[in-house]
A protein has these predicted regions:
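Acidic-enriched catalytic cores of C-N bond-cleaving enzymes acting on peptides and small amides
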Residues: 184, 193, 214-303
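Acidic/His- and Gly-rich active-site-bordering loop/insert found
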Residues: 2-117, 136-143
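Short small-residue beta-strand/loop micro-motif enriched in glycine and branched aliphatics
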Residues: 112-114, 209-215
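Generic secondary-structure signature for well-ordered alpha-helical cores
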Residues: 13, 24, 50, 136-139, ...
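Acidic/histidine-rich catalytic neighborhood of metal-dependent amide-processing enzymes
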Residues: 112, 118-194
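Conserved active-site and cofactor/substrate-binding residues in soluble primary-metabolism enzymes
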Residues: 10, 14, 36, 40, ...
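Predominant activation on well-ordered alpha-helical scaffold segments within soluble catalytic domains
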Residues: 46, 125-132, 161, 225-233, ...
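Flexible glycine/proline-rich, aromatic-decorated loop/lid segments
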Residues: 190-206
Length: 303
């Protein structure tokens, strides 16, 4: 292991330069004008996978952006890990809030700033370089590896389900590793064994055939904005519990051992509240903040 760590330290500057080149590609999947950049990023990713020593690296075409796959399956008798990540990134607006150009990676106080540095190119790059270090120094990996990197995570992964279904046997593994979720705290690695899903609905409420001037018609007809506010206000009780019938029916209760493990974590509610800039924390009264964040569903409003 020491030789692997030494290799990483020796190649640190090269790693940073390569990561900067990766981060310089504006692979914004949500914007059609960046379609060629997303493709270029997929090709860059595939070439990086080949360079580190992965086998059978391919760009699999989909109706959308390519899915890049590679593998190393020479650890006989060892478990197989499927690593998932994505090479597409979010849009960068508003640009005026950036302290440095989003696609010109900048190192400040030992940290690298660019779009994708933390979601998810940085993590993808980290795993690839760990593989490279092992293969360069020992010519082997302690486990078998399969890599799946998509280019549509930031727009809903529309083509990932079909890709996985069509290749169930090819992608079979003992465990799946996804490095696209937050750490518990700085310097505290985290293993997430479950994530909340997402169901969203759009409400369109119309009151009259056309817009009405409030000075001329206010008080004569119901204002849709107020009606919608009244509807939304009934979704939760004063304690934060969702009042929609059946909302909690399929929610698995937390096991006592899980609650005990949560309590062991060094979570400081005052620090958390200060970090997010909230005057106070709020939610279901019978659950701690971590339990509400990690193990309970919620009902939120965007708009």
């Amino acid at each position: 292991m020491n030789t692997i760590i030494d290799f990483i330290h020796t190649n640190r500057d090269r790693y940073i330069d390569e990561l900067k080149a990766y981060l310089a590609i504006p692979s914004i999947s949500a914007l059609p004008e960046h379609a060629s950049d997303v493709r270029r990023c997929a090709e860059w990713t595939a070439e990086a996978m080949r360079r580190v020593g992965l086998d059978h690296v391919q760009l699999h075409e989909t109706p959308g952006n390519p899915i890049v796959c590679g593998e190393w399956l020479k650890a006989e008798g060892a478990p197989t890990i499927l690593y998932y990540g994505h090479y597409d990134v979010q849009p960068v607006d508003p640009l005026e809030l950036w302290e440095s150009p989003p696609f010109e990676a900048t190192v400040r106080s030992g940290e690298i700033y660019a779009r994708g540095a933390a979601d998810d190119k940085g993590q993808v790059f980290m795993h690839l370089k760990a593989i490279e270090a092992h293969l360069r120094q020992t010519s082997k990996l302690p486990v078998n590896m399969k890599i799946v990197l998509e280019g549509e995570e930031e727009v809903g992964s529309e083509n990932l389900d079909a890709f996985i279904r069509d290749r169930r046997d090819e992608l079979s593994a003992d465990v799946v590793v996804i490095s696209d979720s937050p750490m518990f705290d700085r310097g505290v690695p985290s293993i997430c064994y479950g994530l909340r899903g997402l169901t969203y609905f759009q409400i369109d409420l119309r009151g009259t055939a056309s817009d009405l001037h409030s000075g001329s018609f206010g008080g004569a007809v119901a204002n849709p904005a107020f009606v919608l506010s009244q509807v939304l206000a009934q979704m939760k009780d004063r304690g934060g519990r969702v009042k929609v019938p059946g909302f909690y029916d399929a929610v698995r209760p937390l096991r006592e051992e899980e609650r005990a493990e949560f309590k062991k974590l060094p979570f400081n509610e005052k620090h958390y509240r200060k970090e997010i800039g909230a005057p106070k924390l709020f939610g279901e009264r019978d659950y701690t903040t971590l339990e509400r964040l990690w193990a309970r569903p919620t009902f939120e409003v965007n708009g």
